[in-house]
Amino acid sequence: MTNPAPLAARYTDPSPRSLRPVEESDFAPSNAERVLLTGASGMLGRESALALLRAGYTVRVFQRSDSGIAALLPDTIRPRFEQVRGSLTNRQAIEQALTGVNGIVHAAAKVSVSGDWRDYERVNIEGTKSLLDAAVEHAIPKFLYISSPSVAHAGAALVGAGNGDASPEHARGNYARSKAVAEKAVLQMNGTALSTGEHLCTSALRPHLIWGPGDTQLVERILERARAGRVPLLSGGTGLIDTLYIDNAADAVVHGYERLKALAGRAVVVTNGQPRTVAELMSGFCTAVGVPAPRFSVPAPVAVVAGRLIEKVWALLP
């Protein structure tokens, strides 16, 4: 996978794949295998679809709205890209999407810092289980689930945090808890016998803090607050944090899918493997777009109390 350049350079260096125009020469010949990718409207879904196409797969995306991917593809590659619109809460739409599929990469999820538990349960848990059940009915032997380190990380600052078993009981927030339940369901289905005589092979990837061109989550939120002067550094920003550049995340999806047998029944945390201080991370993002980097610091105990108060307020909102 790509070894990331310094953060400030990463946005201006034209070499990253995600910043280059999509060209026909990037794509391997078709390998005649069709992969269903759920949730292709976001940054990870879009780049994963392109990475799978580059690797020679036919890719069928499944989400509620147009992914916009077809417009990026050369005319000769476009026949290998398919799109089915539908929701994970609609079993009939799932059945339609799985026809003729050889494997599944499940990235779709309800992602938000707040919301009613039932909404997370319906999409992230019940939707995943419905997709799993349909995969067994259609005798589809490959199922790669895109999870999150938050399913096994309760907030402790530890090297390797997030690489333990998914724990719904200790996960923080509805998103993490629902993803933890779903991941456990995916891994428990590993080895399920299929009508073809094969067995279902499942694994989970836990990408950590994905960022890159097109990001509307991590980077966009940091920059929005930095422009308004509202980004404090916790204890001076000295804490270490690892992230995952989008090119590496998309490569991990392809490698994980192609190595499902080796990863069967397991979850894998994916990062750049280059921990940086929070101050360096934020400074790099801000410098790259000409925004002043955060300078004021908040003591950790104050931030913890404020965070707990915010969590309680969110819980009271409709």
Model-inferred region functions:
Residues 119-125, 161, 171-183, 209-212, ...:
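Short-chain dehydrogenase/reductase
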Residues 170-203:
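Active-site Tyr-X1-5-Lys
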Residues 256-318:
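Mid/C-terminal beta-alpha module of Rossmann-like enzyme folds, strongest
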Residues 152-153, 200-221:
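Flexible, glycine-rich beta-alpha linker
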Residues 82-126, 134, 154:
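NAD(P)H-binding glycine-rich loop region in Rossmannoid oxidoreductase-like domains
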Residues 27, 33-55:
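N-terminal Rossmann NAD(P)H-binding glycine-rich loop of SDR-like oxidoreductase domains
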